[in-house]
Amino acid sequence: MELETHLSKYFTLAFTHKSMGLEMREKLAINSSATLKEFLQTIKNHCPNIKECMVLSTCNRFEIYASLKHGAHANEQKSALLKILAQNKKMSVSDLEKCVLMSVDESAVHHVFSVCSSLDSLVVGETQITGQMKNAYKFAFEEKFCSKDLTRLLHFAFKCAAKVRNLTGISKQGVSISSVAVKEALNIFEKERIKDKKALVIGLGEMAQLVIKHLLNKQFEALILGRNEAKFEDFIKELEEPKKVSFQNIENLNAYINEYQLLFCATSSPHFIVQNDMLKETIFRRFWFDLAVPRNIEKPVLDNIFLYSVDDLEPMVRENVENRQESRTKAYEIVGLATMEFYQWIQSLEVEPLIKDLRELARISAQKELQKALKKRYVPKEYESNIEKILHNAFNTFLHHPTIALKKNAQKEESDVLVGAIKNLFNLDKSSANHAQNLNLYKCEYYEE
């Protein structure tokens, strides 16, 4: 597809589990709002050709999504961003260069849609990534780092992800990093013939909550160590068996760390939470799953502790990928079609074509009525040319203020809805109007029909 110059230039930089090891992903990870805001502000200050920007940082990827100003060169923006990353994260540009994937225009849109649809995830079909992208978009939008361009892109990405889930069934098995970890833990317990199905879970964020739900489904009991007991009380209201879950403040970690054979750790802490100086010898073997990036557990010095990181779970994930190959093929077809539909939709929402259509509609309507008047001899034929000029001036005058208002509002976030409403009102393009009506700019999602 040949893109017209007035359309937004989309741009992505991606570092993922496919191109970068856990140790380097730890360095890139951003786990606090303050750090994320500071990083986005640095980009805004040093990259004047980047119009809008957002960052997606998860355990398996660090990605920058942006729209570029007209005439900006993607390779120059890539170099500038890698330099910022290198300085910010104390890494070398050459190391980053080896691991980064840059995508521009259609490729960038296709990449964002694929990520949001969980086709690029370590565990294909997991649904957590869509929520993570919504949170990343919402933060950038509320902090005014992104506006119309990325709003359009992300809304369509969420719509695409929903379509992939609904039409392929790729997420029906509910597989995620957390479920793979719990499944592996269950396998270990069966091999080790461990009958006491109890687990210690450190953290109460989204990943930790998923772990707890999977543990309960496998008939485990869980002790949660966290900082916010009120959050725990709200969480257990969602559970079918809340009595199997208990809570202690994380300050009591030393009292429990050597009591459990099974441990899951998933917090947003940038430092080790479980450290070697906390450990004591035990007569039983221990199995620990560190699902955080950066890692939360220091590499154990004791021989009877077996530690699994996110990357260690990859071999267990491959079977999941192979089993879902047919669904993936269909999903990629949906993503490819969505990419084309996105650009068609964007073009339909441009203000200039709408103004042209309104003027043409006015001209056709005026000409139609003039021909009726001539046919019924309400006006002499020799006046036709002069009447055409009068009508032309009349509808130009009538459309003057709406034209100025449309151009003025063209760069605002709500312009898509405005253009769609006008198209619907004048019956110019019902398909694009329906898209705009379903768009909810503030919840960053589409309403289901």
Curated annotation (Swiss-Prot):
Catalyzes the NADPH-dependent reduction of glutamyl-tRNA(Glu) to glutamate 1-semialdehyde (GSA). It comes from the Bacteria. The record marks H111 as: Important for activity. The gene is hemA. NADP(+) binds at G203, L204, G205, E206, M207, A208. One of its GO terms (molecular function) is glutamyl-tRNA reductase activity. The active site is at C59 (nucleophile). During catalysis, the active site Cys acts as a nucleophile attacking the alpha-carbonyl group of tRNA-bound glutamate with the formation of a thioester intermediate between enzyme and glutamate, and the concomitant release of tRNA(Glu). The thioester intermediate is finally reduced by direct hydride transfer from NADPH, to form the product GSA. The keyword Oxidoreductase applies. Homodimer. It catalyses: (S)-4-amino-5-oxopentanoate + tRNA(Glu) + NADP(+) = L-glutamyl-tRNA(Glu) + NADPH + H(+). GO terms for biological process: protoporphyrinogen IX biosynthetic process. Substrate binds at T58, C59, N60, R61, S121, E126, T127, Q128, Q132. Its EC number is 1.2.1.70. Pathway: Porphyrin-containing compound metabolism; protoporphyrin-IX biosynthesis; 5-aminolevulinate from L-glutamyl-tRNA(Glu): step 1/2. Belongs to the glutamyl-tRNA reductase family. It comes from Helicobacter pylori (strain Shi470). Possesses an unusual extended V-shaped dimeric structure with each monomer consisting of three distinct domains arranged along a curved 'spinal' alpha-helix. The N-terminal catalytic domain specifically recognizes the glutamate moiety of the substrate. The second domain is the NADPH-binding domain, and the third C-terminal domain is responsible for dimerization. This is Glutamyl-tRNA reductase. Keywords: NADP, Oxidoreductase, Porphyrin biosynthesis. CDD domains: NAD_bind_Glutamyl_tRNA_reduct. Pfam families: GlutR_dimer (PF00745), GlutR_N (PF05201), Shikimate_DH (PF01488). Gene3D superfamilies: Glutamyl-tRNA reductase, N-terminal domain, NAD(P)-binding Rossmann-like Domain.
